């Protein structure tokens, strides 16, 4: 997720973590870089979650193995920091070491409350950030170019993140549960999108709705903005900030045969509970699905 700020942010397993704590170092294979140019303009109702799911569908779950996915282009430039976090968060689902966006004015504006004592101005911070940009003559293992002007909301099927289809091809699929949250889509921007769709509506009687804000700070902000109230009035259960159902713990674990529409990042077999099926999607699609009880394009409500 931190790749959205221009950082090299790679996850490690427990063994590497223990070595890092004890020795102060971690061993990494030097990754190559795959540049992903995103052109065009996203349609209303299409989000960064749809973008990264589409990219994973094109690359496959092993397509970025031992590589950093460097996201660039007009679509990335127009994204908020939180949207970029979603983009980078799921780079690993294509096998990538991490995802990264070059820091720009959006980055400086977002970080300014935290770094204003270190720089004379945002312009000075931005100038400092530029040293971390890729060189004009940088070598890439691969350069991908996508025009996403016609991209539709994406939904996963089967048990791999690269199994994705436009929402229209999955519309009408029954779900037992809708889960909104996780490190992928539990930020305030995500909760606002879902709450806007849910406001004044109630979820289907056949659906359990579970929402888990990503952090205590986000929970408090959602509470202050009235978002938590909207979720509760619509029929959602609001949990404490947690990884929760994403990895089959806490509230929202699936029973065998149950189906969940989820804003999380992984749909592996048994991930959310033995015998359960997980369909990945954006918060907007998840909210619409909760209302109807079947996978639904939010733009049709």
Regions found by a protein language model. Name each.
Residues 1-301:
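Fe-S-dependent hydro-lyases/dehydratases of central metabolism
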